Each structure stands twice: as C-alpha cells, then as structure tokens.
C-alpha cells in the first residue's frame, strides 16, 4: 500500500510530531511518501529514510482578512495543484492529510477518479464563515475523517460525513520517553538548579492559547505564598507569519516583560526550541498545560510516560488523557490563584505526588506507538475496502 502524506507547513509542532511518530510506527507496513514544504519537517522525514516531495504549503489563517485571506487562498490554490500533480505521478492508494489545512489542499486537489482522502483533524478551527466552509468540505468530500480527540471530533457534529468520525488519540514513543534513560539531572545542572529545587515546565509553542502567561502568574502567586519554584518554558514562537491568528513574536516579548513585572524574571527560564524534551520532563516535578483549547495534549502523555504528573486545563483534550486527582490535576483555565493553591497542596504531599507518578506511568502505556500505527493501518484498509 502506498500512502501520500500531506502537511501544509514545514514547521514541526504537535501535529507534525504525531505524524513523524506514525510514519516511524508504520515502517515496513506502508510505502510512505510525504508532501510538505522544505524545512524542518522535510529534514526530519528524510532522516527517517522516507521519500519527500516539496510543495509550497500555506500558513493561511481561518479568519478572514482583507489582505492575508487573498494571499492564503493563492497559496492554497498553488499547493493543491502541486498535490494533484504528485498524485498523478506517484499514484498512491490513499492520501492522508495530516491537518485541517492539509485536508483542504488534498480535497481541492482530488479528481473523481483519484485515491480516497483521509482527513486527520488534529486542530481546533475557530468560528467563522471560512472555517464552516472548510469543515463542511471535509465532511462532504473526505472518504474518512479521523480526529485526535472527541473534543476535536465534536466540530463535525451536525455535519454529514461519509462514515463515522473516528477518534484515534495521538501516540507516545515509549522508547524515547523512558524515565530509565532520560537524565533530568543534566538539565538541572545546565540551568544551575539544585537537585531539591522545585521545577515546573511548560513545553509548547509560544502562542497565547497555550497559556504561558497564566503559568508565569502561577509562579508569581506561588512566590507570594512563600513557595519558590522555577518555571521552564520550552518552545518558540514558531508560527510568525502575518497570516497567523496571533502575533506570536510579540507574545514572547510580552511574556518576558510579564515575568519581570511580576518580580519572577529570575524564576522563569526561556529555553527556546529543544530536542531534549524527555530530559526536560524528567527534570520537572510537574508539567503545566494551561492551554485554553488544547486539541489533544500530546505533551501530557509524554510527561506521564516519564512519570511526571500533569496539571492541565479541564477543557479540550486533556480530560480524555487522564483523570483529575488520579494521574494529575484538571483545573479551570485562566485562574492562577486556583492553580497556585492546588499546586502548593500537591507539592506539599509527597505520598500523593508519588502515587500520581506511578498511575501516570501506567496510563501512558495505553498510548503506545505500535498499537496506534496498527489502528491507523486498519483505518486505511477499511477505507480502501469501501472503494
């Protein structure tokens, strides 16, 4: 079976990491070709020994704009034409679109005799006319729709799809995220932190909806309670084009200013983009996920696989990953005083924290990569059997 994977951006964030994991998990079972722009993702694909085909791609926003929308539509049109030519040349059995935007490219590229398109929806689409058009197009024309959480699948409520929307949670590579092989002490030594220092971490792209500003406020609230902690912010302002929904570069500047303003500038460490995420998670006592609208929360599973409990918002995907009070805590978003209070109590109860670590390890094993790849392969086979 030959599958053409389509991704609209060269940047590597959560959706792309999940794609790379799937590609690795399918090794030897599927002939894989990836179409995406040149850049970080293309390099990672080639490093896996997988064929890469370059396309223009797009970072078009789903929000309408008098200038950016027309540019985005032009990018989408040119990229769709490139995908159509690739399909004609490569003759794949199936096209797997890795995101909502990638699904738009693949569906616009498809002709009636072309291979079926599987739309893998991993992102929350903002309200708006263009968003409604895209979701309706995906529902009507995709041979199959997979969502990475029930929360994301809910975007298709009321829309008629060719089959049921399947919820398949993102996987974790338990060999890479292994507490026996990752040295958290190396991170603490790099940052000059004592072994008994309390460390919190947020691992995410720098963008407002990820809530790093709320995490900084939690650190300030904890300091006001006499609990000194260090916050590690791992991630960068990846999506910084004029067509994106937020000014992420400006957001990073505001985060740095906020830390200074609240008097915790020395307690907040901006680590930038890091490849040693397992070590960062091993160094942390808790992973914070203060996102407003997390589609799934892959980093939560990775933290749990490292035995690091997670404190996340109770909206979006995290409630599907773990139970509050069992493997971590689920709290209302944007309430730093509540978060500080709950975190202070948890850190002050070593037995409870140790129990959460053990339960987190057990739960993370349920997201194992090989099983995920097998489920996805079955999804491919089901779609092809329906042709």
Where are these regions (language model features)?
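Conserved acidic donor-binding segment of nucleotide-sugar-dependent glycosyltransferases
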Residues: 324-325, 329-336, 345-350, 365
């Amino acid at each position: 079976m030959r599958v053409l994977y389509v991704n609209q951006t060269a940047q590597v964030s959560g959706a792309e990491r999940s794609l790379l994991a799937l590609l690795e998990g399918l090794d030897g079972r599927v002939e894989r070709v990836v179409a995406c722009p040149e850049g970080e993702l293309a390099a990672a694909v080639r490093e896996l020994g997988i064929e890469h085909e370059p396309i223009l791609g797009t970072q078009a926003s789903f929000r309408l704009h008098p200038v950016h929308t027309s540019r985005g539509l032009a990018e989408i049109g040119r990229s769709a034409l490139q995908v159509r030519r690739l399909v004609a040349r490569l003759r794949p059995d199936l096209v797997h679109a890795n995101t909502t935007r990638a699904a738009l490219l693949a569906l616009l590229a498809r002709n009636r005799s072309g291979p079926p398109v599987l739309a893998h929806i991993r992102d929350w689409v903002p309200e708006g006319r263009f968003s409604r058009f895209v979701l309706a197009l995906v529902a009507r024309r995709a041979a199959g729709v997979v969502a990475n959480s029930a929360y994301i699948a809910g975007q298709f409520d009321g829309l008629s799809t060719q089959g049921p929307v399947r919820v398949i949670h993102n996987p974790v590579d338990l060999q890479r995220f292994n507490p026996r092989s990752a040295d958290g002490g190396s991170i603490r030594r790099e940052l000059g932190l004592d072994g008994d220092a309390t460390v919190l971490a947020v691992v995410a792209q720098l963008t407002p909806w990820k809530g790093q500003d709320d995490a900084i406020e939690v650190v300030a609230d904890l300091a006001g309670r006499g609990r000194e902690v260090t916050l590690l912010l791992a991630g960068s302002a990846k999506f910084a084009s004029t067509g994106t929904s937020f000014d992420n570069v400006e957001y990073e500047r505001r985060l740095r200013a906020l830390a200074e303003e609240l008097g915790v500038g020395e307690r907040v460490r901006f680590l930038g983009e890091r490849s040693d995420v397992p070590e960062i998670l091993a160094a942390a006592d808790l992973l914070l996920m203060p996102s407003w609208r997390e589609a799934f929360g892959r980093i939560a599973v990775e933290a749990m696989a490292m035995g690091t409990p997670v404190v996340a918002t109770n909206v979006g995907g995290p409630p599907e990953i773990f139970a509050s009070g069992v493997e971590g805590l689920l709290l209302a978003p944007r309430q730093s005083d509540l978060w500080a209070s709950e975190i202070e109590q948890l850190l002050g109860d070593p037995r409870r924290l140790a129990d959460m670590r053990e339960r987190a390890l057990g739960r993370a094993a349920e997201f194992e990569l090989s099983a995920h790849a097998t489920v996805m392969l079955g999804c491919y086979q089901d779609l092809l059997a329906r042709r």
